[in-house]
């Protein structure tokens, strides 16, 4: 902790591991370009630091969700190709053009607005086309996309990329994935001049049929397992530590936390951490989460509150479980996937919620 911020958690982000993960995914992609998804502040790791680290590793194409994220990405990555996945909000075309950003167009209305802007400017500006193959969120249907191929609707647009998004690529042998792969291949064949991109983190490991010319990993870059149920080929990127504020011994029958939802089964030693759900640590992990103190797994007891977490450190060495020491909530064998599972959610949500008040440290 710094002298001005002695409370709270410390989020350590290993940019060397981030770069190594990109290189591992690029190797797996076997000839396809490996882009990087850096939306949601690079999954909570900091777009201003993660983006340049990925650029230095060799990444040249980046994806974000919002225009505001793209503006931050452009400031950090002046030479990169940057696509905005959530498309073209009405009236936003000038901002895209002024910052050399590329919208991912997913409806006839967006295509018409972008084309009209290009005509008015006398420029054919680049954009991606989004075809929906099963997610039913954003994108043209396969039939709508096929109707555009070779037609006048795209004459004024420098369409550069065709994308879709896999629903459940992490599920081996998934029938929905097989159908998406086939539908996307059918549409991609009608746009031979466009780079095609289907594979996400898990899709990168599905072989050439799901990769096409570009893969777009996100979660795996930041240490998430792209193949749940199997060994994680990615290196951990994020570590979360919190300071122990106080240690106390409690007798059998003592309760801890709001609503007295935990009762000591015997004499226990409890440590209170300077961390809570206001820091993005999930309240849903109450009674299920764990932390590591001096190599020992210690259960979270009682209800996780806004600013504090209670650990049962009875089995941890007393010299380690003391005021001012640190407990590790992500790291030391506790990966983001496990933390998510213990909170009844996914590691993506854990990553993107962290760091609201945490001190950040980067390993370059």
Curated annotation (Swiss-Prot):
Chain positions found as N6-(pyridoxal phosphate)lysine: 39
Lineage: Bacteria, Pseudomonadati, Pseudomonadota, Alphaproteobacteria, Hyphomicrobiales
NCBIfam families, per database record: alr
Primary gene name: alr
Coiled-coil region: none
Keyword Transmembrane helix belongs to the record: no
Catalysed reactions, semicolon-separated: L-alanine = D-alanine
Keywords: Isomerase, Pyridoxal phosphate
UniProt record similarity statement: Belongs to the alanine racemase family.
Protein name: Alanine racemase
SMART domains referenced in this protein's UniProt entry, alphabetically: Ala_racemase_C
Domain of life assignment: Bacteria
Entry EC no(s): 5.1.1.1
